[in-house]
Amino acid sequence: VTYGETTVLATVNAAKEAREDISFFPLQVEYREKHYAGGKIPGGFFKREARPAEHEVLTSRVTDRPLRPLFPKGYKNEVQVMITVLQSDGENMPDVLAGVGASAALMCSTIPWNGPIATVRVGRINKDLIINPTREQIEESDLEMVVSGNNETIVMVEGEAECMSEAEMLDSLK
């Protein structure tokens, strides 16, 4: 998935057999921003990529939450969704592309899933709503919200805002 000059690769894989020894759905979503995506190569003592950063773990969770309820009830095959940022322009946020890419990868697969979903970031500057604002626009924005949903409903909302009315918040979800 590419937006501006930011590119994210999303892949999915599922076990052929269900795990009978578990009582939950084993979904693993992993989001990673490789240093090379931003034009950096790890140097010095550490030459390899480190463990996931906090924002990568949080992005994995924000990507997992809207995907999980759309799998069939009782589905127990292990599913892995791997999302890698291949290129980042430093302007467009790759985390919302993770949800779009994961949805597209699941739709292209044979894994049973009741998608697709879309994921967008909503910002607001001077009472004007902006879809997928740039990093610079987010700095000016009094609202930063990530919304995932399909044509029937909103599946997940996560974000923060300065003081605003309930009507303004609901308007930003439309």
Task: For every predicted segment, state its role.
Residues 19, 98-103, 137-138:
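A glycine- and small-aliphatic-rich helix-loop capping segment at beta-alpha/alpha-beta transitions
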Residues 44-46, 97, 135-136:
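Short intrinsically disordered coil segments
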Residues 54, 58-62, 76, 97-100, ...:
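Conserved active-site and cofactor/substrate-binding residues in soluble primary-metabolism enzymes
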Residues 66, 97-109, 172:
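Stable alpha-helical structural segments in soluble proteins, enriched in small hydrophobic residues
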Residues 93-99, 116:
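Short glycine/serine/threonine-rich phosphate/pyrophosphate-binding segments
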Residues 109-173:
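Mobile "lid/hinge" segments at catalytic clefts and subdomain interfaces of large enzymes
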